[in-house]
Amino acid sequence: MKIPNMLFVLSLVGYSWGAGAWTPQPWVPEKGVIAVEMAEGGAWSFRHTGIKNWAVNITERLKVMPGDRYELVCETSPLDETRGRFSMNLCLFDAKGKALDWAFANEMMKPGRKVATSFIVPAGVARLYARFRGDGPAAARVDVFSLKRVGSVFPEGYVAPQEPELAAAAQRDFETRDAFDGDSGMTETLCGKGGFFLRDVAANGKYRPISEAADFLLYVKESPVDGGRAFDVTVRERSGRDRAVSLVYAIPLPEGPIAWHETLRRSETFTVGERQYSVSQGNAGRGRHARWPFAAATCGGRAFALGIDPEAPAFHRFGANANTRQLYVVFDLGFAKEHPEAHVRFYDFTFDAAQALRGALVAYRRLNPEMFRVRCSRHGLWTVMDSLKNLPGLEDFGFRFRGRMSEITFDDEHDLLTFRYTEPSTWWVSVPREQKGKAFTLEDGCAYCETLAARGPTEMKSARAQATPQRYAQGWKTSVIRDADGAMVGQTCKRSWCEGVLWLLNSAPGIGGPGAMNDFRVKIAPELFDARYSEPFPKGLDGEYYDSAEMYVTPWCDFAREHFAGMETPLTFDRDTHRPVVWKGMIAYEYIRAASRLAHAKGRLTLANCTPIKWWFLVPFLDVPGSEIWWVKEKGEGGVSWEPMNDEDFMYRRSMCGGKPLCFLMDAPFDHFTKEMTEKYFQRSLAYGALPSFFTWHGVSTFASNIYFRRPDCYERDRPLFKKYVPLCRTLSEAGWQPVNGLLASDNPQVITEQFGDIYATVFNLSDKPQTVRLKVLPPSVATLDELVAESTQTVSAGVLTLTLPPETVRVFRFK
């Protein structure tokens, strides 16, 4: 690996070209596959030839202040025929060096793209650096790069107040990309007002009452619901022009401190500024999307909440603002002549304020029972193994769900549910055998796919089969995503399962119009559902399986105008150009909603990988949500470090799944994944009623050889742990997680407790140190409790149970 003396200059305003003392730093988990080189005129280039994740840090860590406004300019050009896509983003850190966001201000790049954007340093950020990152081959010449501070939203400079309450509030009291107030906020005359407001984002306008928006018609149907009101809203743009707007519905809040309920274990009271809980969505909308389907706040002794109807979502975020005295939802909407309307539904409701966000979740579940409906009563582990016939002692592992169709009769005999595999938004095109190992460009891939499309026919070989290459190619012509320049979005790839081209597709069922051969029809084949599910459930095929449900490799936005009319859900807009686009979240939503409705109509089930992570709106249509997970990180020349999922992420997933099975597949280098790690994995999963299984470690050389259930050295070593923990996990999962714990309460924040069904409660030490906890037993007259992990009986004294738990250890109590 050659890293030349390519240097930057750091000035008071940031980074720009020149002589200095810092070099772009590559990172990649493969050796000898990335190089950074000097070019003429002070430019530089990079080339990555491997297949795994990579990054080139463009700057060192810069010291910044909240509220600082920066401009970022980058111009790239092609280096050679390697045209792989990559992204440019900022990595944010707090004052202690803890990473806060690895993909802030994310920009999708390709050689030849010029980016000029600005951002404001968010709350709590002390340092940041810029980087390129990607997956697979990529190369580009970087002709211009500049990161400069151009001002601050605080004219006199940022000074944090000394009072703890004000200091915390001031950290967020400025406009960011996702803010509601600040430079583009509510005018003073609208503060404290409720109702609908509209902002013309492209014109950098203020929020105005919807009645002042002459180009828009708003239709609202209001109806009573349990504890509140439902709003069925349609917005129509009348001019036929491309538009980018933010539609707001706000609830006025009374005077006094506002308690913002951010997570199930965290609430914050504030008196100035704004609070939001959202996740990055790249260049879609204003860049941030609400993680939860609802938001909750209490103020003046009253509880206020807003929530989205899962049958009619759009790109949205929630927040509470103490300055404007409003709880609000914002929808970032795009309009075009091909798609001039947007339809959303949401609720304005109340909840039990004493239970904070858990109380709001109870109320939201009551409003949306179908979202949390449990269709699968018997739970178990998930596997994607091609064959289980030769796995000895199969019953010890507790399998229930299979993401492969290779042994349907065997599955029926062993009470396993079999799901048919599809992956929305991708088409992995393997090159012809004679081309393998040779140079293959995206242009070559396009020509090859055109040949396949012309060849035909497009009929499926059978109702259960995957599509033929010819059928895929026909769908590709209709559904391929296009970037801001109108180019088809794809990349060359060399993976263990595909050497060739990966195309990214808009998989919504309406693309191309009625009867079109689009990606949805290619993969789901609705016309074959009667034949596919001809046997009575659970005999034969049991449902549909959606891999990569949150579409990790798909670009945030589809700019193809020919796709706009085919979307049922609202468009959004590109953050930087304000052009109307299709957000990939709604592509996944429309694909999974339509396919799941077909499956449920046949009495079948649905399984998905990689959700819920950032998107809540897929789970309502799933019966078995799951995710591959990575809880270990490779270290240097060998070994791994243990980095499990944190409580906040775990509770988000558990909350969105409700009583549905929450399944995991651990991906790890199993040469270094110890028996102790397996037990930690099982104990943490048990604490949340999740179902822990294993898969592999991805990569061309390790994928097949590292599959856990093909390694007797792993599964035989861990067999006693499966026999001990999986039955307990299944018992809790089938009992069903409860939002409010009416059995136990902990006095130690490092020791959490959750309830399952009517009689089970888990107690878990989150920390890496022993913890003592006093558990208040909430039901009266309980003298003893059965503990199921250590198989003991615990005595309750005066309504209290005292425990000392080792690090990362769980206990399960059964109430008689």
Residue ranges and their predicted role:
Residues 17-205, 226:
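Extracellular and organelle-lumenal recognition/adhesion modules and their flexible linkers in secreted
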Residues 101-104, 148, 152-156, 161, ...:
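Carbohydrate-recognition beta-sandwich/jelly-roll modules
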Residues 134, 235-239, 763-767:
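Asparagine-centered strand-capping/turn motif at beta-strand->loop junctions
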Residues 338-349, 354, 413, 584-776, ...:
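Active-site-proximal substrate-binding groove within the catalytic cores of carbohydrate-active enzymes
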Residues 379-388, 395-403, 499-535, 573-588, ...:
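The substrate-binding groove and active-site-proximal loops of carbohydrate-active enzymes
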Residues 420-538:
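Active-site-adjacent "subsite" loops/lids of carbohydrate-active enzymes
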Residues 523-618:
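Active-site neighborhood of glycoside hydrolase catalytic domains
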Residues 797-816:
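C-terminal beta-strand-rich structural cap/linker in extracellular carbohydrate-active enzymes
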